[in-house]
Amino acid sequence: MPKRKAAGDVSQEPKRRSARLSAMPVPFTPELKPKRASTSRKTKTTNVVEENKDASTIPIPETKPEDVKDECNMENAENGEAKIMEAPIPKMEAEEVKEQINEDTEEDGGEKKEAVAAEAKDDELKANIQDVEKDEDGKEHKDTGEEVEDGKIEEEGLNEKPGTAKSEDAEVSKDEEEKGDNEKGEDGKEEGDEKEEEKDDKEGDTGTEKEVKEQNKEAEEDDGKCKEEENKEVGKEGQPEEDGKEDLHEEVGKEDLHEEDGKEGQPEEDGKEIHHEEDGKEGQPEEDGKEYLHEEDGEEGQPKEDQKEGQPEEDGKEDQPEEDGKEGQCKEDGKEGHHEEGGKEDLHEEDGKEKDGGKEDRKEEGEQEVAVDEGSDENKVEAEEEGAENKDFKQDGEKEEPLSIV
C-alpha cells in the first residue's frame, strides 16, 4: 500500500500544476477583419475607388490592323451606319491547311490502293457471273461488260500512278459510281423477290380465306342441325306436359264432383244419425219402467217399422246417384228424409204425453216392469245393429260414387 502524502505535499500540488500549465503555449486565433485606420469613412472610400481605377487601367500596345478597323466601325456607327467588316484569313493559315491535307492523303494512299484492288477482284467475279446470266438470257449486255472492264483497266492505271489529291478524288468518285450501279442492280433483284413474295402471300391469304369460309359454313350447318334436334326434343317434352295438364284437369273435375256428392250425402247421413239418437231417447223411458205395456208395445213397434222403412229409403237414396249420377234426385231424397224425421218426432211427442198421464198405474204393475226391461234391451240391440248397417252404407256409398262419375 502506498503511503499517504503529507499535508504539505497536498497543498503544494496545485502550485506545481499551475506551473506546468503556464509553460504550455497558448493558441492564438488571428482576427479575420483588419483593424480600421484612424481616418474617416468618406476619405477612405474615395481612396479605394482611385486605387481600383489605377489597377484596372493597364496600358496595352496596339500593333494589329484589326484595332484600326474596329475604330473605323465605331466612327461609322456614330454617324448612323453600322458596318461589320470581317477580317481576311491570313495566307499562311491556308497554306498550312493544304499541307496537312496532302500529308493525310499520302498516308491513306496505301490503304486505299489495297481496298481498291480487293474491290476490283470482287467486281470481276460479279461481272463474270452477270455475263453468264446475260448470255443465257440472250447475250444482250455484252457491251456493258466490256465497258466495265475498260473502266477497271483505267482505274488500275490511275491507282498505279502516285498522283495528287485530284487523281485520288476522281478514283473515289468512280468507285462510288460503280457501287451505286451495283446497289441499283441488287435493289432491282430485291424488288423482284419482294414482288414474288407478295404474290405468294396473296395466294396464301386467298387460300386461308377460303378455308375459313368453309369452316364457318360447316359450323353454321352443325349449329342448324343442333337447333332442329333441340326443337324436336322440346316438342316431345311439351306433349307429355300437355297430356299431364289435361289429366290434372280431369282429376280436378272428378275431385270436385266427389266433394259435391259428399256434401249431398251428408244430410242423408245426418238424418240417419238423428234417427238413431231418437231411437235411443225412446229406449230410455222404457228402461225406467214408466210406460204401460200397450205404450211399450206401440213404441217398440214404431221404431222397428221406422227402421224398416228407413232402410229401403236409404238404399234407394244411395242407388239413385250411382245409377243416374244426378244431384237433383239426391236433394229430393234428402228432403223426403227430413219429412219422415218430422213425422217421427211428432209420434214421440204424443207418446210422451201419454207417459205423463199413466205414471200412477206403473207403480202398481210390478210384473210389467220386467217386460219393460226386456223390451229396452231389445231396443238397444236393434239400435246398435242399425248403427253398424248405416256405417256399411256410408262406406259403400263413398266407394260407388267415383265409379258412377267416371
Curated annotation (Swiss-Prot):
Residues 188-200, 312-325, 366-376 have a biased composition (Acidic residues). There is a cross-link at residue 98 (Glycyl lysine isopeptide (Lys-Gly) (interchain with G-Cter in SUMO1)). SMART domains: HMG17. GO terms for molecular function: chromatin binding; nucleosomal DNA binding. It is found in: Nucleus. Residues 63-72, 92-101, 110-126, 136-159, 166-187, 201-239, 246-266, 272-284, 290-311, 326-365, 377-406 have a biased composition (Basic and acidic residues). One of its GO terms (biological process) is chromatin organization. Residues 35-44 have a biased composition (Basic residues). Pfam families: HMG14_17. The modification Phosphothreonine is found at residue 29. Its main location: nucleus. Residues 1-406 are annotated as: Disordered. Preferentially binds to euchromatin and modulates cellular transcription by counteracting linker histone-mediated chromatin compaction. This is High mobility group nucleosome-binding domain-containing protein 5. It comes from Mus musculus.
